[in-house]
């Protein structure tokens, strides 16, 4: 006998002897395909549990997986300084693609603008240094001024290098996390999909 709500164990009575059926996950009985006294073949689907919760879990994990995958693709493009190209599997979610594309261009533009400002400052100091070196030769400026400008120029070059390095370090760290999320969520989806498949209860 199978109750209206199955908590994991039910019984059917074939023509030969009683068999015990078990569901690893349990749940609410949605459909019952056999009656007491019916002959049941091996591996025959005899009942199905309500898939609502399991389908919701699979859908939730799939959405997180797609988001992590899109982020991973963007970050790989940032780290390798290559065009952003999304896999075909994400083409059905244009909002997700648009969001990551906007973020990709925004981050690249911000880096480019910061580099531009830094290079302008470097150019100005380099020009001032050249003029000052000429004045030193004519005795109109002190060597101390040259040394000060050389230190300033070195500091600006170091800041430019740090700016670029930090951008790629951050991107690589985020990429590693996104890649790990993609892998772990793929396993979660696989497990939850298996749970969904087990909602169909079969005879032994």
Which ranges hold each PLM region?
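N-terminal or membrane-proximal amphipathic helix/coiled-coil initiation segments that transition from
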Residues: 28-109, 116, 123
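Short, solvent-exposed beta-edge and connector elements
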Residues: 9, 14-36, 41-42, 46, ...
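Long, charged amphipathic alpha-helices with heptad-repeat/coiled-coil character
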Residues: 82, 86-89, 93-204
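Aromatic-capped interface at the extracytoplasmic side
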Residues: 1-15, 194-200
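Structural signature of transmembrane alpha-helix termini at the membrane-water interface
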Residues: 2-3, 76, 164
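Short beta-strands and strand-coil junctions in structured, solvent-facing domains, enriched
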Residues: 18-20, 54-55, 198-199
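Ordered, soluble secondary-structure elements with a strong preference for glycine-centered loop motifs
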Residues: 23, 55-59, 176
């Amino acid at each position: 006998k199978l109750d209206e709500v199955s908590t994991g164990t039910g019984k059917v009575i074939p023509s030969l002897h009683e068999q015990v059926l078990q569901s690893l996950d349990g749940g609410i009985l949605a459909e019952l395909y056999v009656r007491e006294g019916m002959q049941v073949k091996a591996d025959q689907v005899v009942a199905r549990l309500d898939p609502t919760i399991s389908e919701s879990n699979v859908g939730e994990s799939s959405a997180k997986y797609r988001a992590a995958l899109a982020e991973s693709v963007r970050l790989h493009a940032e780290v390798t300084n290559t065009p952003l190209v999304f896999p075909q599997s994400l083409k059905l979610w244009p909002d997700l693609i648009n969001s990551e594309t906007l973020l990709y261009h925004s981050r690249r533009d911000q880096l480019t603008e910061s580099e531009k400002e830094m290079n302008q400052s470097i150019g100005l100091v380099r020009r001032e240094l050249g003029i000052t070196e000429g004045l030193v030769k004519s005795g109109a400026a002190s060597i101390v001024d040259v040394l000060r400008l050389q230190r300033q120029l070195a500091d600006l070059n170091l800041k430019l290098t740090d700016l670029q390095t930090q951008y790629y370090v951050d991107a690589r760290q985020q990429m590693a996390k996104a890649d790990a999320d993609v892998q772990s969520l793929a396993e979660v989806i696989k497990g939850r999909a298996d749970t969904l498949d087990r909602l169909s209860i079969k005879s032994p």
